[in-house]
Amino acid sequence: MKLAIIIVSYNVRHYLQQCLDSLYRAVEGIDAEIYVIDNHSKDNTVKKLKGKNRGVKFIACNHNHGFAKANNMGIRRTKSEYVLLLNPDTIVGENTLKECIRFMDEHENAGGLGVRMLKCNGSDAMESRRGLPTPMTAFYKMCGLCAKYPTHKKLGKYYMGYLPWDEPAKIEIISGAFMMMRRTALDKAGLLDEDFFMYGEDIDLSYRLLKSGFDNWYLPTKILHYKGESTQKSSFKYVHVFYEAMLIFFKKHYGHLSIWLNMPIKAAIYLKATTALIKTTSEHIQKTLGFMPDRRRKSPLYIFISTKESISRCRSLADRNGLDAQYIVTQTP
């Protein structure tokens, strides 16, 4: 088996079906298998999708195990040369996987690989390339210096904004939304750390791949990632869980500095969480009173991912109907 694709789902049935539809074309010509680990969804994901996706192996959990443990359940069932951790809210181009596998085959020391992710508005997702969140790198991000100087090699290292978007590059942290790994590298580095329930586990595993002597790479082949569509990033719960995950990472890899880091990191967690709580409460009150500004797009953005021939037809359709569209051309194998 060349490739095993592991998808962890939780109440994202419609996104998951779109993801699977894109994968069916992407795996053509590849010896691949697809696993969906459902974390006890309330939207009947397994019941609704299992019958119409008979080539997919569904595993229904009796409760929510979290991202790391659910992925590990899938990984342990596979013996493929490469493993891909893929978010259910993604759409993969028909040649994305072939390009990634070809790159990994040609770079024997590549332990992990990430790709160029596009957000639902068509812009580049900054987490496509990230640097290791050392204490100083994390400090620069939390205090806003990373956002102010995104292309600076030191201040902007969290998102590695100094790297070109259209060229392959060595990076440090791969996003768990699309994380392809070599089996031998994964065996040496170990599976995802299940102390992380959600967020941070991709950072931890990426770091362990580097510490095991492998390289992590960014490849500019594009996928669509609906990040934020099912998660309110400004919510109290999201901010608290995210920064708690960062605290677990710091304790694990920078334990010798924990005396100096625990207090400021904890302070950052609760400051960010409190700010998010105030913001969401304020927005709720404004919305209730009718003062909330309309943030809806006047015109939706359409993203077409296909071959050059198909894109030409899509472009004509968009032009005739005045659609705001972006086009991703995949190469014909």
Locations of the language-model features?
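A conserved acidic beta->alpha catalytic loop
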Residues: 22, 38-46, 63
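Glycine-rich, basic loop-to-helix element that forms the pyrophosphate-binding segment
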Residues: 60-78, 99
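A short, conserved alpha-helix in the catalytic core of glycosyltransferases
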Residues: 164-167, 172-222
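Conserved donor NDP-sugar-binding/catalytic core segment of glycosyltransferases
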Residues: 91-127
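Short, flexible, basic/aromatic active-site loop/helix in glycosyltransferases
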Residues: 132-171
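Active-site-adjacent helix/loop segment of glycosyltransferases
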Residues: 207-285
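Short, well-formed alpha-helical segments that are part of the catalytic scaffolds
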Residues: 7, 12-27, 314-315
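Short aromatic/hydrophobic "clamp" motif used to bind/position activated sugar donors
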Residues: 83
